[in-house]
């Protein structure tokens, strides 16, 4: 039942709308005379990391002006609406912070899926005939695949359209990008190693985009990202969850699924390029032609 849900793009697009509606509902629970913060709303959704999501969508609620930053400073427009309800001196609010939200905490549902998939992670020395780089762009809704043979010869490139409506929330990128990637890869007939523009085990719940795709489809995957999402670096080795999970080589290359650290080191020596591993560098160029730099982030 879980696997069929993970393949259903419409289900996850609806879930994304549910998140936005839940946020609106939470804001409308704030009584007159109270305010709340972005962080309190994120916690009510199930994870304080969702503050950026709250900041992106809170103005969809009729009483959005009751949501303030943690320093309680408000904008002139917000002040004009809020000063009829609470005390404001200068541009600072003096009012009780509402925290008693009634919420279904939808982000906890996503965490449970991530925790379930963690049990499917495998460490292996993969066998493959092709190496496929995968990147997603948003301007023209493109997923790009750069397909190489083992001799680093580019065999072909593919582009597919996607219809992603799930919002961007840090550490939940798999439910935004992983679902359409899984739907494309499940129909490919390649014995391949997949390099995905995102993270692997360097994720708070070991479930970066590369690990998500790898565990759902039981494929060998590697994550390759510009920035470190989670963990620490010592001597160019990336550590997360008290174990080495990858290497910093100007970008962050981490184990996704069915690979291991020794294999990763050998693969990087052969396939590293200027900005990314070669397959991602090619896929990234394809999506940039269509999207510019509008992608909000990479998990």
From Swiss-Prot:
Q: What is its EC number?
A: 3.1.21.7
- What Pfam families does the entry give? DNA_binding_1, Endonuclease_5
Asked if the keyword tRNA-binding belongs to this entry, the reply reads no
Q: Which UniProt keywords apply?
A: Cytoplasm, DNA damage, DNA repair, Endonuclease, Hydrolase, Magnesium, Metal-binding, Nuclease
**Gene3D superfamilies tied to this protein:** archaeoglobus fulgidus dsm 4304 superfamily, Winged helix-like DNA-binding domain superfamily/Winged helix DNA-binding domain
Q: Which GO terms describe its biological process?
A: DNA repair
Q: Enumerate the InterPro entries for this protein.
A: Endonuclease-V, MethylDNA_cys_MeTrfase_DNA-bd, MethylDNA_cys_MeTrfase_DNAb, WH-like_DNA-bd_sf
Q: Which reaction does it catalyse?
A: Endonucleolytic cleavage at apurinic or apyrimidinic sites to products with a 5'-phosphate
Write down the position(s) of the site called Interaction with target DNA: 168
UniProt cofactor(s): Mg(2+)
Question: GO CC terms on record?
Answer: cytoplasm
Where is the protein situated, by its record's location annotation? Cytoplasm
Name the segments for region: Endonuclease V: 81-299
Q: What is its main location?
A: cytoplasm
* Binding residue positions for Mg(2+): 135, 197
Q: Where is this region: Probable methylated-DNA--protein-cysteine methyltransferase-like?
A: 1-80
Q: Name one GO molecular function term.
A: deoxyribonuclease V activity
Q: Of which family is this protein a member? A: In the N-terminal section; belongs to the MGMT family. In the C-terminal section; belongs to the endonuclease V family.
Q: What does this protein do?
A: DNA repair enzyme involved in the repair of deaminated bases. Selectively cleaves double-stranded DNA at the second phosphodiester bond 3' to a deoxyinosine leaving behind the intact lesion on the nicked DNA.
Protein name (record): Bifunctional methyltransferase-like/endonuclease
Source organism per entry reads Nanoarchaeum equitans (strain Kin4-M)
């Amino acid at each position: 039942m879980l696997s069929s849900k993970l393949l259903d793009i419409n289900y996850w697009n609806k879930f994304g709308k549910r998140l936005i509606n839940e946020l609106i509902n939470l804001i409308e629970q704030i009584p007159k005379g109270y305010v709340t913060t972005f962080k309190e709303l994120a916690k009510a959704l199930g994870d304080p990391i969702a503050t950026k999501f709250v900041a992106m969508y809170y103005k969809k609620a009729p009483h959005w002006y009751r949501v303030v930053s943690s320093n309680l400073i408000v904008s002139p427009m917000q002040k004009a609406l809020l000063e009829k309800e609470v005390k404001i001196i200068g541009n600072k609010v003096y009012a009780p912070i509402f925290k008693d939200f009634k919420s279904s905490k939808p982000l906890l549902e996503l965490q449970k899926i991530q925790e379930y998939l963690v049990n499917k992670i495998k460490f292996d020395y993969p066998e493959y005939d092709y190496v496929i780089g995968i990147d997603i762009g948003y301007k023209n809704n493109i997923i790009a695949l750069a397909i190489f043979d083992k001799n680093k010869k580019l065999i072909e490139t593919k582009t597919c359209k996607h219809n992603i409506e799930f919002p961007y929330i840090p550490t939940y990128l798999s439910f935004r990008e992983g679902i359409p990637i899984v739907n494309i890869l499940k129909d490919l007939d390649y014995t391949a190693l997949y390099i995905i523009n995102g993270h692997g085990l360097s994720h708070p719940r070991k479930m970066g985009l590369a690990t998500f795709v790898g565990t759902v489809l039981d494929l060998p995957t590697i994550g390759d990202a510009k920035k470190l999402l989670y963990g620490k670096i010592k001597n160019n080795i990336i550590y997360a969850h008290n174990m080495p999970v990858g290497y910093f080589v100007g970008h962050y290359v981490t184990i996704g699924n069915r690979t291991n650290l020794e294999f990763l080191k050998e693969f990087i020596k052969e396939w590293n390029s200027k900005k990314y591993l070669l397959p991602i560098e090619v896929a990234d160029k394809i999506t940039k032609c269509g999207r510019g730099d509008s992608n909000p982030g990479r998990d």
